[in-house]
Amino acid sequence: MAATFALHGWWRTS
């Protein structure tokens, strides 16, 4: 769960 946001959410939220 957190891994998805760690490598697929850092640029998505930027």
Swiss-Prot record:
GO terms for biological process: L-tryptophan biosynthetic process. It comes from the Bacteria. The keyword Amino-acid biosynthesis applies. Keywords: Amino-acid biosynthesis, Aromatic amino acid biosynthesis, Leader peptide, Tryptophan biosynthesis. This protein is involved in control of the biosynthesis of tryptophan. Pfam families: Leader_Trp (PF08255). This is trp operon leader peptide.
